[in-house]
Structure formats: C-alpha cells, structure tokens
Amino acid sequence: MTDNNLFPEPKKIVWRVSELNRHVRVILEQTFPLLWVSGEISNLKRYPSGHWYFSLKDDNAQVRCVMFRHKNMYLDWMPQDGAQVEAQALITLYEARGEFQLTIERLRRAGLGVLFETFERLKTRLQQEGLFNPEYKQLIPPYPQQIGIITSTNTAALRDVLTTLQRRLPSLPVVIYPAPVQGKEAASAIVTALQIATQRSECDVLILCRGGGSIEDLWAFNEEIVARAIAACPIPIVTGIGHETDFTIADFVADMRAPTPTGAAQLAAPDRQDILHRLQYWQHRLQQAIERNIERRMQTTDLLAHRLVHPGERIRYQLIHLSQLHNRLLHAWSRQLEVCKWRIEAFRRRIQFTKPDINTGKRYQQELAARLQRAMVYRLESLQVQLIRQQQHLAHLDPKAVLERGYSITYTAGGEILQDSQQIHTGDNVQIVFAKGSAKANITETNK
C-alpha cells in the first residue's frame, strides 16, 4: 500500500538522487523493525577501522551487510566465509551508492536459536521448581579447611584458579576432581566429579570452572543433569564459567556465581592479609578485655583488703569488749551488794522495833552479812578464773601465737588460706607464712 504523502506528484517536485535515497532509507528504517535473517557469509572483509563488510546469501539471493566495530567486538567467535549464521539486523539503504543493505546488530551461528530456546525453557522450568531460590543457597564458609576444583586439567582456567589460591592463602589444601568441560561426555563427567566429591566429603567448598568460549563450548553447564547434581550437592559450590557476560544454568543453581575462574577462587578462599588483620583486631579486643578484667579484679581486691581486719586486731577488740563486760559485772555486783546491805539494815531496824532480843537478831544479821560477803568473794573469784581462761583461750587463737609455737600458714596463689589438698594441684605456687618471714613453694605432689 502506497502513501501518496510520501511521494508528491512529479509535476510539482523533481527529486534529486541524494534526496530520494535519503527518503527511501528513512522509510525502510521506520517501516521494518529489527529482524532475524539466516544465510551464508560470503566476501567477508575486515577493515582496519574494525568494521566488517560481507554478504548474506542463500540459493536464490544475497544482500549486502555491515557490522560495525562497536557491535562485532563482543563476539566470542570469528566468522568465516561459508559459515551459516543468523543475524539480527536493521534494514537500511547506503545513500552514497543507493545500495540496499543490512546493518547487523547481533550475529550467531546457525542453530543457536534452538539452543537459546532450549536454554530458556530449562531455565524457566527449573526456576518454577525453586532450584534458583535464595533460601536453598548454602553459605560459602569464610575459612574453608580444604577446597575442591572441578575442571579439566592442563587448562588456563585451572592455572588461574591455582595461582589465585596460592596468592591468597598458600597454606590452603586443594583437591582437583578432573572432568572434561566441553564435548558430549562433559555433562556426565561433571556429574560424576560432583558425586565423587560428595562421597569423599573432604572439601568445605567446591569451585566449578572453565574458561571462555561459545555457547556450544559452554553447553555442558546448561544440561539438566548438571543443574540437578549441583542442587543436590551438600557441599557449597562456587561457579566461575566463561567470561563476565556468560551465564549458564549452572550459575543460576550454584550457591554463588563468579564472573571468571579467578573470581571464583577469590570468593572461595579468604585472603591471608584479611585473616591477619582480623586476628590482630580480635587479639587487640581480647587484650583489652583481659586488661579490663584484671583492673576490676584489682579494684575488688583493694576493696576487700580495706575491709579485711587482721586476726590480731579482732582479738584486741574481743579483749576490750571482755574488759568492758568485766567492769559492768563488777559494777552490777557492787550495786547488788549495796541493795542487800540496805535491805539488811532495814530488816535490822524492823527487828529492833519489833523484838526486844536485839543482840540475837544482830548476831544473826552479822552472820548473814558474813555469809553474803563470802558468797560475793567466791562469785567474784569464780568469774575472775573464767575471765583468765577466756583470755588464755583468745591468746591461743592469735595466729602470731600459733606461728611462734612452730606452726605456719599456707596461702594459695589467689590469697586464700590453704585448708584442703583439693584446693591445689601439682605445679601450683603457694606462699608459706612463718612467725618470722615467709617463703614461696611449688607443689610437686598432692595426696587427697
């Protein structure tokens, strides 16, 4: 269908060639969206500018194509004449020559569309099953005791991983589980390596890696059996497959994805300097805690020492108290004696007024007074004897007196008086206090 507004009537305007070509280019670019075209590459020319020029052809026709440098630089493979490809292109017109051409945005080998569809279908199905869910991801141990590597031997990827591990933590043991990572048997070999690592259970984390390549080269990591083996593995897995722009099904299922094999090694192994810095930090924290604890204990010791009374002082206080009790007792007996005397005198006076035989009553009163005097003297002497005994008993309890009799007092390293052999152990230090001086000793044997 032709829009009459696009081409004015010939009688009114005569088009110049450049105007016509520009107008046709605009119509083509605005009319046709990006589309995929398949064909065979021919006459491929790579210019110093980095741009590629070639033709796409089939059995019946061909079309000129251009792929600019900022587009082709991201290809991980090099097209050749005769290669069957699929190109995502914008239809345009090269105005200078009036040539119809395709500006290529993306280029892939023929058949990769099927691979991408297979990739997306499997990705969607596994995602719906929950294999990509974060809650199923295992934590990567911060300080693994041993690391396992699943990859092909004698490859740049393996060398990069080993070099990185050696640089970050040279003392970390490494186990290599060799498996081809490209080809028809690669997927089953990777699954077998994962099973062996699980059975041997000798590593804390696994690195699954390989270098860059095309989608076909990396396809083993898009196989369902590999994805399910990774999901079932009880050992945390870090993937480092291809380059940063490469994503595989294995990356989505793994516990952690790194952009490259080197990046996987950096995620799996801690850096020695970081460990040293962390150890220094905790050493400093521990030292501060110990110093604060010692300071608190010293303050507590000073407080207890201030409150602690020497045994000699306690005996002196007891003697003073005993002397006070003695004085109070004497004062009480004196008062009681005065009361008794007053009563006797009152009784004597009453007798004198009531009975004529004053002499008999007086003799009886004198006898009672003498008996009372003897009783008082006897009681005082008895109390005096008890007081002397108490003083002697207190004197025997004085640690200095005990030490002067040839005994000694042994203290533990914590300052406690040693009363039981279970308070100490072989190798402990003790302090022995004598009547004069002290000594330190080391325990070589204890008997329970």
From Swiss-Prot:
Q: Which PANTHER family match?
A: EXODEOXYRIBONUCLEASE 7 LARGE SUBUNIT (PTHR30008:SF0)
CDD domains, from UniProt?
Answer: ExoVII_LU_OBF (cd04489)
What is known about its subunit structure?
Heterooligomer composed of large and small subunits.
GO MF: exodeoxyribonuclease VII activity; nucleic acid binding
Organism domain of life:
Bacteria
Q: Which gene encodes it?
A: xseA
Keywords of this entry: Cytoplasm, Exonuclease, Hydrolase, Nuclease
Lineage summary: Bacteria, Pseudomonadati, Pseudomonadota, Betaproteobacteria, Nitrosomonadales
Mind telling me what this protein is named?
Answer: Exodeoxyribonuclease 7 large subunit
Cited function:
Bidirectionally degrades single-stranded DNA into large acid-insoluble oligonucleotides, which are then degraded further into small acid-soluble oligonucleotides.
Q: Name one Pfam family in it.
A: tRNA_anti_2
* GO CC, one annotated term: cytoplasm
Main localisation, per the record? cytoplasm
User: Per the UniProt record, which EC number(s) apply here?
Assistant: 3.1.11.6
* Reactions that this protein is recorded to catalyse: Exonucleolytic cleavage in either 5'- to 3'- or 3'- to 5'-direction to yield nucleoside 5'-phosphates
**Family that this chain belongs to:** Belongs to the XseA family.
